[in-house]
């Protein structure tokens, strides 16, 4: 679950972390009220969307008067802001108005989970303000990595090591890293990114930007944070899928995918790409999907106007092939299927599943294996 910058900063402020004074504004009137509350100019106005690289896309501006604030707010609120990370753009429905911070030096700092060694990874760099993806390509040696054992927690020697590598006061920076680590753990975050973290001209350290992402699997432990989620930043089909406990992520291709199991879903998308096509989504119906869930999954899948063909790839284990077939038959009663559907079934009750589909009268194309299914789906989508 992604949070807006202003929400992330409010959470981090509770841990005693230094963030600029600021207010969220949903319209021009609130933007002006925020400016008045902050005591004047210059101010920084930031578009609040769930995408990085906002500054390069014109989503961040320093304003020095009421006129500039009003003009920028009117120009960007309600508009779609496209960035490198979000080429299709996101609607700007709110702004963050902050006091401008006098910057001496910018740094990068993030905390995430490194699954390869089951440790918490802290990344830092003197190259603040750059996207970490760009930095890893252009200057990989500029990224400092420190691994933390979650059982032991972050140790004093690790905060000192990071401080010395960045050339920052160990006492001041060490406390900030420790508090950020505590916030990361308490919030069940999957990512906590500060870019940039800045050293001011007065020698203070300030979190100039903040991104917090909460692990969806732990959201039930944070009902107050769950309520902060801005569904306007999420694709409507993803919101719909979440209601039925489906793992759905919209992509840019035209081959719809329905698969059971995340690993098989990833493999299916890879095979579609290998065969020269492009998947339109990630959709894992899971092992214990009911007939109703399968029907809703198919309905959501075919609601995407970009989908020109569907590849259903099921290996029946916990999710039996006959149950999947019944779900598809139920979905066909609800959805007027106008696009080609390719089905590959293997595993538990596969013959029963194939028989049900054959006797249903549905015009589904059968595939003998994944490669055959991918090729057929791509051909039918043309």
UniProtKB/Swiss-Prot annotation:
Keyword Nucleotide-binding appears in the UniProt entry: yes
Entry's EC annotation: 6.2.1.5
Pathway per the UniProt entry: Carbohydrate metabolism; tricarboxylic acid cycle; succinate from succinyl-CoA (ligase route): step 1/1
Enzyme class: ligase
Names of required cofactors: Mg(2+)
Domain ATP-grasp: 9-240
Biological process terms in GO annotation: succinyl-CoA metabolic process; tricarboxylic acid cycle
Residue positions binding Mg(2+): 195, 209
Record InterPro entries: ATP-grasp, ATP-grasp_succ-CoA_synth-type, ATP_grasp_subdomain_1, Succ-CoA_synthase_bsu_CS, SUCC_ACL_C, Succ_CoA_ligase-like_bsu, Succinyl-CoA_synth-like
Binding annotation for ATP: 46, 98, 101, 106
List of residues binding substrate: 260, 317-319
Catalytic activity, reaction form: succinate + ATP + CoA = succinyl-CoA + ADP + phosphate; GTP + succinate + CoA = succinyl-CoA + GDP + phosphate
Keyword Nucleotide-binding: yes
Entries under Pfam families matching the protein: ATP-grasp_2, Ligase_CoA
Domain of life: Bacteria
Signal peptide: none
Co-factor binding comment: Binds 1 Mg(2+) ion per subunit.
GO CC terms, sorted: cytosol; succinate-CoA ligase complex
Protein family (similarity comment): Belongs to the succinate/malate CoA ligase beta subunit family.
Functional summary from the UniProt entry: Succinyl-CoA synthetase functions in the citric acid cycle (TCA), coupling the hydrolysis of succinyl-CoA to the synthesis of either ATP or GTP and thus represents the only step of substrate-level phosphorylation in the TCA. The beta subunit provides nucleotide specificity of the enzyme and binds the substrate succinate, while the binding sites for coenzyme A and phosphate are found in the alpha subunit.
Oligomeric and partner information: Heterotetramer of two alpha and two beta subunits.
Official protein name in the record: Succinate--CoA ligase [ADP-forming] subunit beta
